[in-house]
């Protein structure tokens, strides 16, 4: 019997802050389930402050030579709190060079009284002095000795993507680093395949986040289509291009509920399935992020919308997740008769049948570990991007009973925004091949242009058969000192720690 229930907690969809004890911090899956039992998922975003004894990395003194292969200058057009963000590819630079640039007079954080004052300056001056973002740097800064909440090895059901299908998509099931400066931004979006994500701010200045509760996500999509009519006509899921910036003032004026919160160094942010989020950096900083999954996500993955124009499409097979964790629905799903209905208020208990099944099959596989890219300090060119033919060949490992099943669709029942009706089967029905294009947008070199692009860089699928723990033959590289990835042994946490709602709370028109 599944321990799913409609969560009565957090009816206001406030962004919650969690402070787990050292014991609670030992079991990632169980603590995420606990957070959802408290209603954290209803906000679409939550903050987790690690125990004071915990450290991600002992020292960041040796990272200045890490290469940012494709820094992106974020150029904005628009007015009155509604902007489109374009990206211009810049020359490669090291983290040390980027830090110097971020702290220069041209790009440094302006004087401000508090976070609210800085936020006003951000939206008032967004059109001026285009910042440069060091985004999508493959690798991890977590020490090998860091076992708890090491984003490079969370041990969630997302591991099935690599273990069952041999699929590795950079930034989805391998970590990415993001080096930011004042005003660098991430536009409104949900995660690819509507996965969860986790973001750890290693060091530097804070990051402000905005989030729309999943049960109100459809309202944001409808507003975005009105504000960006050209983009919406060109792609039914154009928000996946990650180019639309909408200010909190505009959201308020249009009655869109949202929350806001500021992440500081040493804190985690967790986004939940179909949770739209956006934000900006206060100054030079470094964050690390990756996607992950829980059994509650599976039905989201089945119906996740897809970019219809191919600009930022990421899809992969849902077969392994349904076959292994929802065996009673597998045959029906293969016939296209499993019309998933997503309830955004639903919570998955920490003792759910799917989670128990995952732990049983996970135990003998833990010694495998996940493969990850090491950080590059010297680079001659970018990693090759898989072509459509390469992608097709890569996914043959998941044929017959392992066909892709990523559904698309946008309609949500307006009478009850918390319930999403069945989505039409289409490109992501069983039998559709997986693709792996993602990121802030598509890289300029993939679009055939030299300077700018409407989106931002695509997260790359690694070439078939490549052991990404080893350097690519195209790269002359040296790893950062110390192991970056480690297997973690999960143990059950003790009694759960009290939580609080964020100061920002949820904002909407009265």
From Swiss-Prot:
Entry PTM: Ubiquitinated via 'Lys-63'-linked ubiquitin chains. Deubiquitinated by USP14 with the help of TRIM14 leading to stabilization.
InterPro entries (UniProt xref): JmjC_dom, JmjN
Keyword Nucleus: yes
Enzyme class: oxidoreductase
EC number in record: 1.14.11.66
Keyword field contains DNA repair: no
Residues forming coiled coils: none
Modified sites of kind PolyADP-ribosyl glutamic acid: 23-24
Described function: Histone demethylase that specifically demethylates 'Lys-9' of histone H3, thereby playing a central role in histone code. Does not demethylate histone H3 'Lys-4', H3 'Lys-27', H3 'Lys-36' nor H4 'Lys-20'. Demethylates both di- and trimethylated H3 'Lys-9' residue, while it has no activity on monomethylated residues. Demethylation of Lys residue generates formaldehyde and succinate.
Protein name: Lysine-specific demethylase 4D
């Amino acid at each position: 019997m599944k321990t799913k229930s409609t969560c009565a907690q957090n009816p206001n969809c406030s962004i919650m802050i969690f402070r787990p004890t050292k014991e609670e911090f030992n079991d990632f899956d169980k603590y995420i389930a606990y957070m959802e039992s408290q209603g954290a998922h209803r906000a679409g975003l939550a903050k987790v402050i690690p125990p004071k004894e915990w450290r991600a990395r002992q020292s960041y003194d040796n990272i200045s030579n890490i290469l940012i292969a494709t820094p992106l200058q974020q150029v904005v057009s628009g007015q009155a709190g509604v902007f489109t963000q374009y990206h211009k590819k810049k020359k490669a630079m090291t983290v040390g060079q980027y830090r110097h640039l971020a702290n220069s007079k041209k790009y440094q954080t302006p004087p401000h009284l508090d976070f609210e004052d800085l936020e006003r300056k951000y939206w008032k001056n967004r059109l001026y002095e285009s910042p440069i973002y060091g985004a999508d740097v493959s690798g991890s800064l977590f020490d090998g000795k860091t076992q708890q909440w090491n984003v490079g090895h969370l041990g969630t059901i997302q591991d099935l993507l690599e273990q069952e299908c041999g699929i590795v998509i950079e930034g989805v099931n391998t970590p990415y680093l993001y080096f930011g400066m004042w005003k660098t931004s991430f536009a409104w979006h949900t995660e690819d395949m509507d996965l969860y994500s986790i973001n750890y701010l290693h060091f530097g200045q804070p990051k402000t986040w905005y989030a729309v509760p999943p049960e109100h996500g459809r309202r944001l999509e409808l507003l975005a289509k009105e504000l960006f009519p050209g983009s919406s006509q060109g792609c039914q899921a154009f928000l996946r291009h990650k180019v639309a910036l909408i200010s909190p003032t505009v959201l308020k004026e249009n009655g869109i509920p949202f929350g806001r919160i500021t992440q500081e160094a040493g804190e985690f942010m967790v986004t939940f399935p179909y949770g739209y989020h956006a934000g900006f950096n206060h100054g030079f900083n470094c964050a690390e992020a990756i996607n992950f999954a829980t059994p509650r996500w599976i039905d989201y993955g089945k119906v996740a919308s897809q970019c219809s124009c191919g600009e930022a499409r990421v899809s992969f097979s849902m077969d392994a997740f349904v076959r292994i964790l929802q065996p009673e629905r597998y045959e029906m799903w293969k016939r296209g008769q499993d019309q998933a209905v997503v309830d955004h208020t639903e919570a998955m208990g920490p003792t759910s049948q799917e989670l128990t099944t995952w732990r049983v099959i996970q135990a003998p596989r833990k010694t495998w570990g996940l493969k990850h890219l090491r950080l590059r300090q010297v680079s001659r060119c970018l990693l090759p991007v898989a072509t459509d033919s390469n992608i097709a060949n890569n996914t043959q490992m998941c044929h017959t009973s392992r066909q892709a099943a990523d559904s698309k669709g946008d309609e949500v029942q307006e009478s009850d925004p918390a319930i999403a009706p069945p989505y039409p089967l289409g490109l992501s029905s069983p039998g559709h091949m997986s693709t792996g294009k993602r990121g802030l947008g598509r890289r300029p070199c993939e679009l055939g242009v030299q300077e700018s692009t409407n989106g931002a860089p695509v997260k790359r699928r690694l070439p078939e058969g490549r052991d990404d723990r080893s350097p690519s033959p195209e790269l002359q590289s040296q790893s950062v000192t110390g192991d970056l990835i480690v297997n973690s042994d999960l143990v059950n946490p003790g009694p759960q720690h009290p939580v609080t709602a964020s100061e920002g709370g949820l904002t909407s028109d009265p």
